[in-house]
Amino acid sequence: MDKEYVGFAALPNQLHRKSVKKGFDFTLMVAGESGLGKSTLINSLFLTNLYEDRQVPDASARTAQTLTIERRGVEIEEGGIKVKLTLVDTPGFGDSVDCSDCWLPVVRFIEEQFEQYLRDESGLNRKNIQDSRVHCCLYFISPFGRGLRPLDVAFLRAVHEKVNIIPVIGKADALMPRETQALKQKIRDQLKEEEINIYQFPECDSDEDEEFKKQNEEMKENIPFAVVGSCEVVRDGTRPVRGRRYSWGTVEVENPHHCDFLNLRRMLVQTHLQDLKEVTHDLLYEGYRARCLQSLARPGARDRASRSKLSRQSATEIPLPMLPLADTEKLIREKDEELRRMQEMLEKMQAQMQQSQAQGEQSDVL
């Protein structure tokens, strides 16, 4: 063996083995009005049927229903790599006659996941924290409008500092190519005008592969992604393809000349899944955590925290309900105080043991 070789070059292999053994968690939210192909696209992206048991309400029922939050989980294994995918769906969004504040349940859900993670992170058992935070939100935009509607703007403005947003134009096969490009530019202009932050692709390093750089730039330019979903295999001439057949021809889901499906799947699965998780933790979650800590510094925050109805016993022995931010900080302080008392007790016990041992040695000498 080369005497100059230490072995640090094998560190990436260690990390790879550890990551493969542990597996990966990813939480994806889909939002947007009904009828834009959200369910079909998700099934197409992950080649699974997550909506097998869903019952589709009729038009009258949709206009009367309120927004609900549904979570569905599935484990996907490919090439020995396991991914635990959690899909957060928002049926009923934008379907009511009065859509005022219909986005608030989504905002609360995202914040509740941050709050749960903050409590778990501040607890005693930090090794087995379940990360239920939303790492990405696919927001579906209608191809039949002239850009973002007021409801779209209100929703995106409410969540853009809490989750990675990827705008998607659903059922893009309803548009001609020039119409698609015009709609994309209109949406980009509106996002800039409304100062809405969407997911920003990281800049490539100088030593990155040229093919990856090209793909990264292509994905940036294609935002918002114009997509078509289909799990049906049709024949286009002599070859089978996944797509949709119309009287005027066939739309191929995985043909980059027909839609942006491949770019969306490449970004979500192959190239940027880990970056979406890192941005969620390092930027979005840390921003939420900083706001929690700042709330303690405001006048009256201590008084508001003291009015919490949750006892210490319920805080440590039973699952916690979702609490206001000030109450969450009270629980954190209580846990810190409890840890400090336990440390003091341990130090006293050690001092008593040392004193007893010293007295025993002294009596032996006498």
Curated annotation (Swiss-Prot):
Q: Which residues carry this modification: Phosphothreonine?
A: T250
Using the UniProt annotation, give all residue ranges assigned to the region (G3 motif). Answer: 89-92
Modified residues annotated as Phosphoserine in this record: S206, S247, S306, S314
Q: Which PROSITE patterns match?
A: G_SEPTIN
Task: List, as start-end ranges, the regions of compositional bias called Low complexity.
Answer: 349-366
For this entry, list what GO says about its biological process. Answer: cell division; meiotic metaphase chromosome alignment; spindle assembly involved in female meiosis
Region G1 motif: list its residue ranges. 32-39
Binding-site list for GTP: 32-39, 66, 92, 171-179, 229, 244
**UniProt keywords, alphabetically:** Cell cycle, Cell division, Cytoplasm, Cytoskeleton, GTP-binding, Nucleotide-binding, Phosphoprotein
Q: How does it assemble?
A: Septins polymerize into heterooligomeric protein complexes that form filaments, and can associate with cellular membranes, actin filaments and microtubules. GTPase activity is required for filament formation. Interacts with AURKB.
- Quote the function comment for this protein: Filament-forming cytoskeletal GTPase. May play a role in cytokinesis (Potential).
**Protein family according to the UniProt entry:** Belongs to the TRAFAC class TrmE-Era-EngA-EngB-Septin-like GTPase superfamily. Septin GTPase family.
Q: What is this protein called?
A: Septin-1
| Gene source species | Mus musculus (Mouse)
Taxonomy of the source species: Eukaryota, Metazoa, Chordata, Craniata, Vertebrata
